[in-house]
UniProtKB/Swiss-Prot annotation:
Membrane topology listed for this record: Multi-pass membrane protein
SS bond partners: none
Keywords for this protein: Chloroplast, Developmental protein, Membrane, Plastid, Transit peptide, Transmembrane, Transmembrane helix
Organelle targeting sequence: 1-58
Subcellular location, record wording: Plastid, Chloroplast membrane
Main location: plastid
Protein name: Protein RETICULATA-RELATED 2, chloroplastic
Known function: May play a role in leaf development.
Residue span of region Disordered: 68-92
Membrane-traversing stretches: 148-168, 213-233
């Protein structure tokens, strides 16, 4: 009996020596750790979301150990099917709106290396051409309406940069069609000529959606820009009481609604077409010729934009000229005298 007991004791020790004991995991060190169990009923491996991606956790219950992190099997991350870690969620920037803007800028530069050059040309050449087009559409080249021209300069500078930023493709939105809300989810997220497998209705949906966005931005920028320009004119009057503007200051709300209409219709169509043209030219032209074409296209685009805004402002009455009214009244009085 003693010999049999000794033999049994030795056999149990040899069996235990071949069993790999499970390692203990201290989950208190990482309170954000997630443990995932397979749905097939066998606990063969644990997939967690630790910072170390290659820790092996063998578990009792059969099967080999799976790896923790982005390379696990089953329902782990990387293979889909309910796992974690397939795509990292974007964290809010500690710098607030400025940090979000910097992240958005980097994302746009990553998607289009020519984006900084386009913005520079838009702000230098484009805004200047916009002001020239605005002045060319006014009597006496706008010299009698410099207050209106200044208002256009302030609002146009804000809007031109905003248009460039909103229409530029980003590294996140490049090739994506699910970034827009509601019924526009299947539409291109940047502009209607964005590369991708989109239908004609999808691209038209982007035109409509961006038009609503630009109209909203135009309304906000019109309110801010008109208030700034009118405030500066009032400040000038306080400093120099003899200063008189040749025209009445533009009504803030009416001028803002005019800008909203201009942005949602004219600017929306022009800038989306411009983005599509630049996309095609970048693929077919040498870099130097392409940059030259960018400058030329933006000059033409902004001259047309300035002229179209003056026409719309005249139609809505947001920028009425006092001298024109005086001339009309004098002509009427002269006709009455002749009669």
């Amino acid at each position: 009996m003693a010999a049999m007991a000794a033999k049994l004791h030795i056999s149990t020790k040899s069996d235990q020596s071949n069993v790999r004991l499970p390692r203990l995991i201290n989950l208190s060190r990482d309170p954000t750790a997630r443990v995932l169990f397979p749905r097939n009923g066998s606990v063969s491996s644990l997939h967690t979301n630790f910072s170390s991606p290659n820790i092996m956790v063998p578990c009792a219950g059969g099967g080999g150990g799976g790896s923790i992190g982005n390379h696990g099997g089953g329902s782990g991350s990387g293979g889909g099917g309910g796992g974690y870690g397939g795509s990292e969620e974007e964290e809010s920037s500690p710098w607030g709106p400025l940090g979000l803007f910097i992240q958005g800028w980097r994302s746009r530069v990553a998607a289009d290396s020519q984006f900084p050059f386009k913005v520079l040309m838009e702000m230098l050449v484009g805004v200047s051409a916009n002001v020239l087009g605005d002045m060319a559409s006014r009597p006496n080249f706008g010299l009698n309406e410099l207050d209106f021209v200044f208002s256009t300069l302030v609002v146009g500078s804000i809007l031109n940069f905003t248009l460039m930023y909103l229409l530029a493709p980003s590294a996140i939105s490049h090739g994506s069609s699910n970034l827009l809300p509601g019924i526009f989810r299947s539409c291109p997220s940047s502009h209607m000529f964005e590369q991708g497998n989109f239908t004609l209705m999808n691209r038209f949906g982007t035109l409509v959606y961006k038009g609503m966005v630009f109209a909203t931005v135009g309304l906000a920028a019109g309110l801010v820009g008109t208030a700034i320009s009118n405030g500066l004119i009032m400040l000038r009057k306080k400093i120099d009481p003899s200063f008189e503007t040749p025209n009445k200051p533009p009504p803030t709300l009416l001028n803002s609604l005019t800008w909203a209409t201009h942005m949602g219709v004219s600017a929306n169509v022009r800038y989306q077409t411009l983005n599509g043209a630049e996309f095609l030219l970048e693929k077919s032209l040498p870099p130097l010729v392409f940059k030259t074409s960018v400058i030329a296209l933006r000059v033409v685009n902004n001259v047309l934009g300035g002229m179209s805004f003056v026409t719309l402002a005249r139609m809505t009455g947001s920028q009425s000229v006092e001298e024109e009214k005086k001339i009309e009244m004098s002509e009427i009085s002269e006709k009455e005298k002749e009669d």
